[in-house]
Amino acid sequence: MEKIKVKEIFNNVYSVDFGDGLKRIATKSLIPGKRVYGEKLVYSDNIEYRVWNPNKSKLGAAIINGLKKMPIKKGTKVLYLGASAGTTPSHVADIAENSLVYALEFAPRIMREFIDSCNERKNLIPVLGDANRPQDYSNIVEKVDVIFEDVAQPNQAEILVKNAKWFLKENGYAMISIKARSVDVTKNPREIFAEQKKILIEGGFEIVDEVNIEPFEKDHMMMVGIWKGN
């Protein structure tokens, strides 16, 4: 481990300066000494931090690229759609600290990887299910403050609205990483982002932030919305 300069930029999210001019972020290690995806562990004032790799996390990429609204913070209850093997959910769990993060994944094999890498994080609740069918996991997931979605499906925006109706508190927040090529490979990504935004607004969201996450992910846009219901 090595010495670094640390500055809090959002609640429980930190910029880390190694003195080389590169922009990096990190979260405090909820489980000190435990890596999830081979990330670098560093320390400052006897506190361990996990460097958050924006090449492996769309939320990390959005923060690096200038995200202004970051609704996930200490005490935030989160539903994470598209947990994959747990890279970003592990950082979300660090930020939320003792608050629950429900991590939904569709593929059983990937869910096994997730459980293996994140089993010590007691606030991460693995949920095997299809994000298109929130009724199937409504007996597990409670009302949440934030929904985060990273699901590569053509109906990405509709999935978020559907889950918000089931689980998101009024005036709660949602964050969605829209992958244009998963919606329609033939259209200009800017058209797709506009269409997906329209679906979100008509579904009951007020969009309060948008961040393009290139060069970390091509044709991806992070949107942040407040749930007003409908």
UniProtKB/Swiss-Prot annotation:
Highest taxon above the source species: Archaea
Key words of the record: Methyltransferase, RNA-binding, rRNA processing, Transferase, tRNA processing
SMART domains, A to Z: Fibrillarin
A GO MF term: rRNA methyltransferase activity
Enzyme class: transferase
Residues given in the record as S-adenosyl-L-methionine binding sites: 87-88, 105-106, 130-131, 150-153
InterPro entries associated with the record: Fibrillarin (IPR000692), Fibrillarin_CS (IPR020813), SAM-dependent_MTases_sf (IPR029063)
EC number, as in UniProt: 2.1.1.-
Regions crossing the membrane: none
UniProt record, GO biological process: box C/D sno(s)RNA 3'-end processing; tRNA processing
Gene3D superfamilies: Phosphorylase Kinase, domain 1, Vaccinia Virus protein VP39
Pfam families per record: Fibrillarin
Function field: Involved in pre-rRNA and tRNA processing. Utilizes the methyl donor S-adenosyl-L-methionine to catalyze the site-specific 2'-hydroxyl methylation of ribose moieties in rRNA and tRNA. Site specificity is provided by a guide RNA that base pairs with the substrate. Methylation occurs at a characteristic distance from the sequence involved in base pairing with the guide RNA.
Subunit structure: Interacts with nop5. Component of box C/D small ribonucleoprotein (sRNP) particles that contain rpl7ae, FlpA and nop5, plus a guide RNA.
Family recorded in the similarity comment: Belongs to the methyltransferase superfamily. Fibrillarin family.
Name by which UniProt lists this protein: Fibrillarin-like rRNA/tRNA 2'-O-methyltransferase
Gene: flpA
